[in-house]
Amino acid sequence: MPNALPIVKEPHPVLRKKARDIAASDIKSKKIKDLIAAMKVTLKGTPDGVGLAAPQVGENLRLFIISDEAEEIDRAETARRKSNVERSSDDIKPYAVRDWSYYVFINPQVVTGSQKKVDGPEGCLSVPGIFGSIKRREKITVQALDEHGKKFTCGKSRFFARVMQHELDHLEGTLFIDHATHLTKTG
């Protein structure tokens, strides 16, 4: 099993650079395969993360991963709404830790997104202890290459869409704190 990578923190310069595309011929290279494997281990080892972009581990590449825990969070939120139960702070990560699967997005491009934007809370592994509210598109569709170099299209809504947009921002050198309101510090 690969080792977890250190997560770079603001103000590390790689977080403010526009990431470079990965050549199709490099996707199956040992370097990229090892990076993806290490990113999965890194994300799994975080208590609060559901997404991780290559710049967050010091690699200026257009690559991010999202745990399928993001889908579980959407399912739980839908069930909560249907049952009219109020959300509590304990609901943020209410799932037993399990071996999540990961979506891998290489050279992602936004295909379409809803006009409707929704305000929601965000934090970031590269900006620890700071949270804020940010408006994001409610739905988004992204086209990318997977870890085998196969093109795919991924359309998501709600929390998963928010995570995709957050990770896409990382690839553009943007952090959530650049657009968030009501920033608060914890710890």
Where are these regions (language model features)?
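Active-site rim/adjacent substrate-binding subdomains
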Residues: 1-165, 170-187
